Every structure is written in structure tokens, then in C-alpha cells.
């Protein structure tokens, strides 16, 4: 594809890193944009955007704002990136808050969890915005027709959960989406919905719990398989399946 990349950051360090990689044939597609500041992971995202005007995250978003780039990809401070995008690019009409969408493997494909941590205390109206954005994103990127949207809750029955969840449920019923009701945690990976919405506090806990549990399962398997030569032989024969499952559950593939 005809894609160009602008690396934003300390130009000297970026170029040193590029020198140790084989970029032959890509030189014309790669440029550097110097940024003198960095948002550290322990900083407040919103404050960093206001105070560090020349941070790599702020400058990268500025490039999109000025029409010099079409998108930003970052492994940096999530809160700072969301804040910078919201302040500099604004949100879509009818959408008040940005939400973090994370594609997660499930039976028969993937589902989208939104919000994964951008808003820990949103209003029910914000959650409806997440549902609309998530539905459009899933249909556009993953495909497969109109996405089913479920509300993460402690049970599937209507009327379950906190007052916040009940308010979200009522508004989602009226939203221009295919809302299928509440979804309890044990039903998510059965892909009862293509899009699962929740507040960022709940979503982030869910993501990190799943990540930690997946790693623990592989640790337990390793201990059990090392109990006998016969088990180790069986594990060797099934190594391809283990590798495939490990890759599917890796946060390197799906985020977390």
C-alpha cells in the first residue's frame, strides 16, 4: 500500500534506531519530525498536553490537525493521546467523549470492548456514544453486517445492575444500534455480541483481569506438563496448538 510514515520524537534517537533496521527501499516513505519533550507514563495525561506543547504525542496529533498526516499510532501515554486528540481534533457531532475500543478474541472471531479505560466515570449518554462508535467501527473494520451491541453487566436480565447500568440500558434501547441487552462476564467470550460497552473503569479492570488470567493459565499448564515425561511428550506433539492459542491471547496482538 502507498503509506508514508512520519516518526515523531527525538530525531537523533529515532534515526539511530532506524540505522539498526533494514529500511532499504523505504527511505522515500519515512521522515522524522523532531519533538523535544516526552510524556512520561506517570504524568497526568490532560496536564501533560497543556504543559508539554512539544511532546511527541502533541506534535503527532498536530500533524493530523494540520493535514500533514491522516492518523496517529502510539505506544505511549494513552490518557495523553486521548486528551490531545479530543482537544486538538475535537469529537464527532453528537459524540461527547472518545472511547478506547479493543478487539478481543472470542469464539468464532473477535469482539470489540469499548470503553477500555479512557473514561472511568462517564455518563449514560457517553456510553451510548461508545455504542454507536463501536458499532460503526466493527461493521467498517471487521465486517459481517450490523453489529450486535451488549451492555456489560452482572446478569443478562433487564433491570440488573447499578442505577448507572439501568440508565444506560434505557438509553441504549432507543439508540440507532442493534442493542441485544445486558451481557454477563461469562457470556462475553461466547460472542453473544460483537460490541460490548461499559464505562472505562469496568472495561480496564476486565481487560487486565483477562490478560493476567491468560498468562496464569499458561503458567499452570507449564507446571502440570512438566510433572512427567509422558505429559511433556504430549505437549511437544501439541506445541503448534499451544503456540496458536498463546498468540491469540497475547496483548501484543490485541492490546490491553
Task: Label every PLM stretch briefly.
Residues 2-6, 11-15, 120-185, 194:
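Glycine-rich phosphate/diphosphate-binding loop of Rossmann-like nucleotide-binding domains
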